[in-house]
């Protein structure tokens, strides 16, 4: 195959990855596998040097420890099977490898926003056309695709199986793309409409943890956006739009209410998780162990007696992999922040588009980590794939700047 055709194939696969991130985990994972094969098949120079593997040490250390704790758990075969959830971590390196330069990274981020804006339109239609009979059920007589999209429409879920996934994906993507609104140029109006549409869909998920993560990401983004007045105006418009929706406003009023039934259940899960951690502080209970042991550790006030996760990512990591595993997991993100922040300080002041990419990635990871205090989003593959894809973008910028003439 000629170089031209090979690059055309890669570009088509990157486009399919973007679409998959927005609508289908099967499409996104398939695209990633084929892109990885493309890198190997073309013997791409970016897979031959250590510089092509950002965050390699913390990711490998975390993965190795996860496998070790699985092998040492009381149900090693079950836990070792669960280590397949480590495979999505390769997304960081695959996306980094297939994006040539900062321009390609900008196109990737822009296309992701537009793909999610399309999903947001579908999500808004889901909620606004929802009949009482479909609030928590599906119409069995409808075609499968229509049934899955327009069924269970009490809360917006897009093409995902549950609203929490859509909320997590939108929180990360909106934080990542907010800084680009200030440098969008002639496309600013259209891009702003796409961003606001996605923000409305985020509100209609009614996922409070995703809202808080989004808010944290926005605050971080505003610290690095020079034309901050534009970003503030857009965010303010989104908030006003959402507060005009009674269900969204009522849901927001319960965020700090400790008497809220969902909050009480999360407190019960937190207590159970801490008890499990005290019993297995070093190596944890193994991957998948929470599902097996939660009925034993659930406190009397817990309504749910079975769960596979604790709605708190750091606690889930610590319980399943021990405190060592938590430290290694934190190392991944600490290393990312240190390197991306250092890059931001080196980006020339006139390289506004590159700065927006780096600030957006930092804001997106902030949103992911804060939202993870209320949901095990590290275990939500769709959310994790989007986050890792965005995390690759600063490293693309870093490589591009290093290759430019002084």
What are these regions (language model features)?
Residues 17, 35, 67-68, 90, ...:
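Alpha-helical transmembrane segments of multi-pass inner-membrane proteins
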Residues 17-27, 318-321, 355-395:
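Membrane helix-loop boundary segments at the extracytoplasmic
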Residues 83, 252-255, 266, 277, ...:
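Hydrophobic alpha-helical segments of integral membrane proteins
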């Amino acid at each position: 195959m000629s170089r031209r055709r090979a690059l055309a194939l890669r570009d088509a696969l990157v486009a399919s990855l973007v679409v998959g991130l927005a609508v289908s985990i099967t499409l996104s994972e398939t695209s990633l596998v084929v892109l990885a094969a493309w890198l190997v098949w073309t013997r791409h120079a970016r897979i031959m040097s250590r510089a092509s593997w950002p965050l390699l040490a913390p990711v490998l250390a975390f993965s190795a420890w996860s496998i070790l704790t699985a092998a040492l758990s009381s149900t090693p075969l079950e836990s070792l099977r669960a280590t397949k959830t480590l495979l999505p971590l390769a997304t960081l390196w695959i996306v980094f490898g297939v994006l040539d330069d900062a321009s390609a990274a900008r196109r990737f981020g822009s296309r992701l926003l537009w793909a999610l804006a399309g999903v947001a339109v579908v999500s808004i239609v889901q909620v606004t056309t929802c009949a009482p009979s479909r609030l928590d059920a599906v119409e069995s007589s409808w075609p499968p695709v229509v049934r899955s999209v327009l069924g269970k429409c009490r809360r917006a879920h897009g093409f995902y199986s549950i609203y929490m996934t859509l909320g997590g994906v939108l929180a990360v993507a909106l934080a990542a793309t907010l800084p680009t609104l200030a440098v969008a140029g002639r496309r600013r109006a259209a891009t702003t409409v796409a961003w606001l549409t996605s923000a409305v869909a985020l509100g209609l998920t009614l996922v409070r943890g995703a809202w808080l993560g989004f808010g944290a990401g926005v605050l971080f983004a505003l610290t690095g956006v020079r034309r901050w007045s534009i970003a503030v105006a857009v965010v303010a418009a989104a908030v006003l739009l959402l507060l005009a929706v009674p269900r969204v406003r009522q849901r927001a009023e319960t965020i700090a209410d400790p008497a809220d039934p969902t909050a009480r259940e999360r407190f019960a899960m937190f207590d159970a998780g801490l008890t499990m951690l005290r019993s297995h502080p070093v190596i944890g209970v193994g991957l998948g162990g929470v599902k097996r042991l939660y009925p034993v550790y659930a406190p009397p006030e817990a309504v749910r007696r079975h769960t596979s996760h604790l709605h708190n990512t750091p606690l889930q990591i610590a319980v399943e992999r021990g405190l060592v595993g938590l430290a290694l997991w934190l190392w991944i993100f600490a290393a990312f922040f240190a390197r991306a922040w250092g890059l931001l300080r080196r980006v020339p002041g006139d390289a506004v588009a590159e700065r927006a990419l780096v600030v957006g990635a930092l804001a997106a990871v902030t949103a992911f980590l804060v939202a993870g205090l209320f949901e095990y989003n590290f275990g939500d593959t769709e959310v994790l794939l989007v986050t890792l894809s965005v995390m690759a973008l600063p490293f693309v910028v870093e490589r591009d700047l290093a290759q430019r003439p002084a």
